[in-house]
From Swiss-Prot:
It holds the Pfam family IGPD. InterPro entries: IGPD_sf (IPR038494), ImidazoleglycerolP_deHydtase (IPR000807), ImidazoleglycerP_deHydtase_CS (IPR020565), Ribosomal_Su5_D2-typ_SF (IPR020568). This is Imidazoleglycerol-phosphate dehydratase. One of its GO terms (molecular function) is imidazoleglycerol-phosphate dehydratase activity. It is found in: Cytoplasm.
Length: 195
């Protein structure tokens, strides 16, 4: 089983993340940011990874530090659970619709962090959630999971639908990239021999 648990404490947040990359989509989520919990649920269910996330942050200021630091800590946990990437499919992609919204996510477990992020949100907030924090979450995750990630919302009118299709597509792309390919024979999927 590819599992990891990371605890990350700063002056702004205290976060514990446990992941099982070979799970069934079970989740226990308590970040103090309800919309973030809803989006993390999409990653777990559509990625078929088990997530246990507990976060305490300076929400009396705003959700920025909590959302970003959850992304950072989740990225660290994914990187630890993936290990040396032997036998990994490495690449994953998904298109996901939700009514009028459609998003595409492509991921590469390259060892090189990079984020291309294109979501033209139709409003600035989804309930109490500042949509700018979506980028902060994924930037933190990318930097610490050491992945290249392309996120494109291709169309959408409802900002909730735009965001949800991105997180669902991320979960599905992650699931594909994390699969172990028996034809690889345990080799690392790179001509370099390492990732």
């Amino acid at each position: 089983m590819r599992t990891a648990e990371i605890t990350r404490n700063t002056n702004e947040t205290r976060i514990r993340v446990a992941v099982n990359l070979d799970g069934t989509g079970k989740q226990t989520l308590d970040t103090g940011v309800p919309f973030l919990d809803h989006m993390l649920d999409q990653i777990a269910r559509h990625g078929l990874i088990d997530l246990d996330i507990k976060a305490e942050g300076d929400l009396h200021i705003d959700a920025h530090h909590t959302v970003e630091d959850v992304g950072i800590t989740l990225g660290m946990a994914i990187a630890k659970a993936v290990g040396d990437k032997a036998g990994l499919r490495r690449y994953g992609h998904a298109y996901v619709p939700l009514d009028e919204a459609l998003s595409r996510v492509v991921i590469d477990f390259s060892g090189r962090p990079g984020l291309e992020y294109h979501i033209p949100f139709t409003r600035a907030r989804i309930g109490d959630f500042d949509v700018d924090l979506t980028r902060e979450f994924f930037q933190g995750l990318v930097n610490h999971a050491l992945v290249t990630l392309h996120i494109d919302n291709l169309r959408g009118v409802n900002a909730h639908h735009q965001c949800e299709t991105v997180f669902k597509a991320f979960g599905r792309a992650l699931r594909m990239a994390l699969e172990l390919d028996p034809r690889m024979g345990g080799a690392v999927p790179s001509t370099k021999g390492v990732l």
